[in-house]
Amino acid sequence: MKKVLALVVAAAMGLSSAAFAAETAITPAPTATTTKAAPAKTTHHKKQHKAAPAQKAQAAKKHHKNAKAEQKAPEQKAQAAKKHAKKHSHQQPAKPAAQPAA
């Protein structure tokens, strides 16, 4: 890793590859008395994948319908009846006020 970094730095500074090779050839030899520690054992953790949800229609994803939508749809009406909802009053005509007999 250090050699790669040194190569990148040397290339950026414009040094020739011969000068770089001469610098790397003079590295000190490692002594035999040093002991290397065993590399730490790496543990690989497996990711738990969630089960994919069932595919739905695009409209169902965007618009969550309430329980009211499950009820039976009303009968279709004419276009005019949809626009002009008239309130029907089932009141009988008002009775005239009772006049006291004089």
UniProtKB/Swiss-Prot annotation:
Superkingdom classification of source: Bacteria
Signal sequence range: 1-21
Entry keywords, A to Z: Periplasm, Signal
One Pfam family here: Asr
Compartment list: Periplasm
Segments of skewed composition (Low complexity): 26-41, 91-102
Predominant localisation class: periplasm
Compositionally skewed regions (Basic residues) per UniProt: 80-90
Annotated TM spans: none
Ranges where the record places region Disordered: 26-102
UniProt modification remark: Proteolytic processing gives rise to the active protein.
GO cellular component, one term: periplasmic space
Propeptide span(s): 22-58
Biological role: Required for growth and/or survival at acidic conditions.
Family: Belongs to the Asr family.
Annotated protein name in UniProt: Acid shock protein
Gene: asr
